[in-house]
Amino acid sequence: MLSADFLHLEKDVEMVNGCADIFHLDIMDGVLVPNISYGFPVIEAIAKKAVKPMDAHLMIVHPEKYFERFAKTGVQMMSFHLEAADRDGNDPAEMLDMIKSYGIKAGLAINPDIAPERVFPYLDKADYILVMSVFAGFGGQKFIETTYDRIRAIKSEISRIGSSCQIEVDGGVSPSNASALAAAGAEILVAGSAVFKAADPASTVEVMRAVR
């Protein structure tokens, strides 16, 4: 929803309701990432109209302080960055358990400069791994091509240990790379600019859904 038209937010919410699978909510604090997005009033407004699950991507420091508050907004998925846990010396496994305690799917996100092997210890705990294919903080960035290898590495380990963990990809996702991302092992594709700036957003979503 970072690329939505916030002056006409309800229109874009209805568009997502009609053609997509989830609402991806990018929460930025200007500390962990160099940008500020939106907070609880916007999320609560979206929640009033959303009929599809809401996925909160927390690009913030001390995310654990806000897990309960986000849970109360009605989100069904919530991820935090491994970098945030590292920064505070927190155990990502414990943080994943905290999210799950609210009955929410728990995800662990990593930026492009974090080795994919760093998430391997948590693949039996996380419901999904969010692989950033751009550096978190801004929409409309160019897709980083090494993302495919990162996805394949994580998918291979998921298969090796028999985990049900899924892979979500966010950043520069579009119809031009959706098929290759799915082939690499991604199950959840987050597209912002490619959808909201398209002449026909619903058709764009349908093209990407067809690759699954």
Language-model segments: residues:
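Conserved N-terminal beta1-alpha1 strand-loop-helix module at the mouth
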Residues: M1-S79, E83-A93, M98, A106, ...
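Acidic, divalent-metal-coordinating active-site segment for phosphoryl/phosphodiester hydrolysis
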Residues: G172-A184
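Residue microenvironments linked to proteolytic maturation
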Residues: Y102
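Internal catalytic-core helix/loop-beta-alpha segment
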Residues: K105-A109, D113
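Glycine-rich beta-strand-to-loop/alpha-helix junction loops that act as flexible
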Residues: I167-V173, V190-A194
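Short glycine-rich anion-binding loops that position phosphate/pyrophosphate groups of nucleotides
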Residues: V134-A136
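Short acidic loop-to-helix transition motifs that present clustered carboxylates
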Residues: D113-A115, S174
